[in-house]
């Protein structure tokens, strides 16, 4: 947890003030059929009201995962604050087999001691399945709640939690000197801050695997350019600004290389830069357009979009070049893919019969599942644990962010109030 604190501290030091209206998760489908769980309000052992409702944050995290449906406080048979106070039979009568209890205690030094226990009410009634405590300052309260959520989620599902992750996205505001903003927020929309403002479009943010940098496309020089910005100090490094198109950056899994698309020689083609030496290697060639690279987790291959067969489809190629292999066959066209961190599936924008939705393809069987039913869906990005996808869609006259689980059952949106929101990118574990 100390290492994760150091990563997040880089954000807090530089971006101390949170600006603009924040996005918030609004669940639209799937929570009612999720696994019920009890998350009891954490006991506050100080005067007045607590600075953060830790139990509420933990409950929201578990609900937002799409895998749990926390019971309403009004329906709770009891409100214990420690494992010894839990009456298992009272909870199992409501179909609940696990309960989270906890406490928040202010310290004389201005800090807070947060503790929780996850209690089994069914398999081995009264057994503590997981527990922890954190001593934090006020600015770390939400982070510590997300930490507890991660631990509870992993204990109950066997899947690493992703509640301490962030999302990057571009907001186009209405008017002003700098109508384009690259922003970063916690996965749930809280603690939003602005990374970069521009009078010209910003596009395609991509996280480095350690979460310390963002690559993106800017048009501030009058033409497209690829840059990498360090979040801790705001330093910007220009990667490519060739004639015509420079776009679609993607960091390799080890962070040593950056793949992108250039059209300096005519057609769009894939290139890879060694970020240490600055050497650029061309990966694809020919008259077709090849763009939107995404890395396989071994760092040896890329999936990408190509119209070499007439319409855009997803192909695979070695990161050192060579012959390509077509991956997608269903739908009139498929593009803008992202490979999951375990390499077992990819998500993509799939078009068929005039509809444009986010689809998932199993890379072993080739089976395809359409995940969304929203309008003009674009730019999917997968959570690092592979359970959720964030993407943008058209709603009314603008673009908003949407969430869908990778089984298609859970859906939510993250509406913004101060502009159109596009190009979401989910961070790695932080």
From Swiss-Prot:
<protein>
    <recommendedName>
        <fullName>Tol-Pal system protein TolB</fullName>
    </recommendedName>
</protein>
<dbReference type="InterPro" id="IPR011659">
    <property type="entry name" value="PD40"/>
</dbReference>
<dbReference type="InterPro" id="IPR011042">
    <property type="entry name" value="6-blade_b-propeller_TolB-like"/>
</dbReference>
<dbReference type="Pfam" id="PF04052">
    <property type="entry name" value="TolB_N"/>
</dbReference>
<keyword id="KW-0131">Cell cycle</keyword>
<comment type="function">
    <text>Part of the Tol-Pal system, which plays a role in outer membrane invagination during cell division and is important for maintaining outer membrane integrity. TolB occupies a key intermediary position in the Tol-Pal system because it communicates directly with both membrane-embedded components, Pal in the outer membrane and TolA in the inner membrane.</text>
</comment>
<keyword id="KW-0732">Signal</keyword>
<dbReference type="GO" id="GO:0042597">
    <property type="term" value="C:periplasmic space"/>
</dbReference>
<dbReference type="InterPro" id="IPR007195">
    <property type="entry name" value="TolB_N"/>
</dbReference>
<comment type="similarity">
    <text>Belongs to the TolB family.</text>
</comment>
<dbReference type="Pfam" id="PF07676">
    <property type="entry name" value="PD40"/>
</dbReference>
<feature type="signal peptide">
    <location>
        <begin position="1"/>
        <end position="21"/>
    </location>
</feature>
<dbReference type="GO" id="GO:0051301">
    <property type="term" value="P:cell division"/>
</dbReference>
<comment type="subunit">
    <text>The Tol-Pal system is composed of five core proteins: the inner membrane proteins TolA, TolQ and TolR, the periplasmic protein TolB and the outer membrane protein Pal. They form a network linking the inner and outer membranes and the peptidoglycan layer.</text>
</comment>
<dbReference type="InterPro" id="IPR014167">
    <property type="entry name" value="Tol-Pal_TolB"/>
</dbReference>
<dbReference type="GO" id="GO:0017038">
    <property type="term" value="P:protein import"/>
</dbReference>
<keyword id="KW-0574">Periplasm</keyword>
<keyword id="KW-0132">Cell division</keyword>
